[in-house]
């Protein structure tokens, strides 16, 4: 897990992009996470390098051509390695090579690059959670069908998929 301070420039750019984008279709929280999502992308780029592309299928293309989709959640505390990362079932068909997971503090002052996981392997190793069920690991009522994997199972680095 890598802690990254959110700079004023990162926050301004994230707010501008979020305003331009508006509410995402199928958003679990009605677009309220757009600013955090764009901050998460900036954090992932700072850690991994590459070029931000912001397509439906992926957000970042690394120098070796690896396509990365960044998944960001907001948090009130530094995440523990037992916390879970999630991929909404609606996004399970995205054409990317790796998922990268980031948490951003609710006040947008700091974020954490949590790690990565190869997309194809993620779907094999993650636990499917149906909307409305209670996640036994944390008591959370699942808002949308999703695939969960604990942070401690992530890999810190992305290895070339080419």
Question: Model-derived features: where do they sit?
Answer:
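Nucleic-acid endonuclease domains
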Residues: 1-66, 71-162
């Amino acid at each position: 897990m890598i802690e990254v301070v959110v700079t004023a420039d990162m926050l301004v750019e994230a707010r501008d992009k979020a305003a331009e984008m508006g509410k995402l279709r199928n958003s679990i929280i009605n677009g309220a996470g757009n600013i955090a999502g764009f901050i998460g992308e900036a954090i992932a780029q700072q850690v991994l390098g590459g070029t931000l592309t912001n397509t439906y299928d992926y957000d970042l293309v690394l120098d070796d051509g690896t396509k990365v989709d960044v998944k960001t959640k907001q948090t009130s505390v530094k995440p523990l390695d037992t916390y879970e990362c999630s991929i909404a079932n609606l996004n399970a068909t995205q054409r990317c090579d790796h998922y990268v997971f980031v948490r951003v503090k609710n006040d947008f002052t700091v974020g954490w690059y949590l790690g990565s996981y190869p997309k194809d392997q993620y779907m094999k190793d993650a636990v499917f959670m149906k909307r409305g069920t209670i996640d036994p690991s944390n008591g959370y009522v699942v808002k949308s069908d999703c695939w969960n994997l604990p942070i401690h199972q992530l890999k810190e680095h992305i290895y070339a998929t080419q």
